A protein has these predicted regions:
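Interfacial segments at transmembrane-helix termini and the short loops linking adjacent helices
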Residues: 127-161, 273-278
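C-terminal transmembrane helix end/exit motif
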Residues: 23, 217-267, 295-313
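Membrane-interface junctions at transmembrane-helix termini in multi-pass inner-membrane proteins
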Residues: 159-189
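Membrane-proximal transmembrane or re-entrant/amphipathic helices at the cytosolic face
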Residues: 264-332
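Hydrophobic alpha-helical transmembrane segments
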Residues: 11, 189-193, 209-230, 292, ...
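Alpha-helical transmembrane segments of polytopic membrane transporters and translocases
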Residues: 40-56, 61-81, 112-117
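Interfacial transmembrane-helix starts/ends
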Residues: 2, 68, 88, 100-117, ...
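Helix-loop junctions and terminal segments of transmembrane helices
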Residues: 81-98, 108, 171
Length: 332
């Protein structure tokens, strides 16, 4: 128990300390970049800075606030996949204890697939509708001036969501197999990558706050590649990348394109309302686009048999739904 608990505590400690250092490096490097290139920043973000009444001395703080507002979207999806990873620990631990290699492999693949089924469409959908979603939430409020700055960050993290979303579930998988020491090491290395990237990229005026996304993505990319490798090595099982990653990504890409296309078409039809109000054609177009994207994704996954029987069973009345879908050969 101690051999599992200690690495888990260390891993959590490293993550929390890294977040503190991460915030500190972003703020300090951004402040340095602004002080050295004040005119560049005033010109680049002139509309938002003037609209918000931001003083020259507060530009760095304002830009960090814009970055922080975009993190809610990044954390929303990862919090869902985090719970999926935790819920799989008992079943996986039992399979490992019984040395049931087939069940271990099946559970690992199921965890990754379900996370991707949730994260891929949500992330790419948010990326495709980043500005409209931000406008829906912040338009007509005191925070609307951050939309032009925050939207690109939301889009970048949306595209990279599948990378961020798989990190914690893979950590849970390794912990369930009794190798909690591995995530602790990969998280530590990832933390170093993140801090170094922040120091380099955030300090570049042309990248500024957007440079923080580079460090985050490279950090988590290293963590999931390393954890995937050790997951396969420790379990002795292979990951079916076609069913777990490729199929959800294909359908999610189509889903995102449909969301974007639907909104662009509806903008020409739903032209009512004041743009500064929440109740207008543009916002309604965004909501319709999201609904269409959900339907397109679900139908697409069924057509290419992207859902597995075990995935459907976990839903309310899942067994009945799974049996019905099996009759039409719509699940893998």
């Amino acid at each position: 128990m101690i051999t599992i608990a200690v690495p888990m505590v260390i891993s959590a400690l490293i993550t929390n300390v890294t977040n503190l250092i991460d915030n500190f490096t972003i703020r300090t490097r951004l402040a340095h970049a602004v002080s050295e290139n004040l005119d560049f920043f005033k010109e680049t973000f002139s509309a938002s800075l003037l609209g918000s009444g931001t003083l020259d001395k507060d530009i760095g703080t304002y830009l960090y606030g814009c970055y922080f507002s975009a993190l809610d979207f990044k954390n929303l999806i990862t919090s869902i996949t985090m719970s999926l990873g935790v819920s799989a620990i008992p079943a996986l631990a039992a399979a490992v204890a019984m040395k049931n290699r087939k069940e271990v492999g099946s559970t690992i693949n199921s965890v990754i697939r379900i996370c991707m089924i949730v994260a891929a469409p949500a992330g790419l959908g948010i990326a495709a509708l980043a500005t409209p979603i931000m406008t829906l939430l912040y338009g007509g409020t005191n925070a609307e001036n951050l939309i032009p700055i925050s939207s690109p960050i939301v889009m970048i993290y949306g595209i990279a969501t599948f990378v961020l979303a798989l990190s914690t579930p893979l950590t849970n998988v390794l912990q369930a197999m009794g190798r909690a020491d591995i995530p602790a090491k990969t998280v530590a290395i990832g933390a170093v990558i993140k801090v170094v990237c922040n120091f380099i990229f955030v300090g570049i005026p042309e990248l500024n706050i957007y440079g923080a996304t580079i460090g985050t993505i490279l950090c988590y990319l290293f963590i999931i590649i390393a954890n995937l490798y050790f997951t396969m090595k420790v379990s002795g099982c292979r990951i079916n990348f076609i069913s777990t990653i490729v199929k959800p990504m294909i359908c999610a890409t189509v889903c995102a394109l449909c969301a974007y296309g639907t909104r662009m078409l509806l903008l020409n039809v739903l032209t009512f309302g004041d743009p500064s109000s929440r109740l207008n054609g543009a916002n309604l177009s965004t909501l319709f686009a999201v609904a269409v994207a959900v339907v397109v994704y679900a139908v697409g996954m069924l057509l290419i048999k992207g859902f597995a029987y075990d995935d459907i069973v976990m839903l309310p009345k899942g067994k009945k739904i799974a049996k019905a879908l099996e009759k039409f050969h719509l699940i893998g």
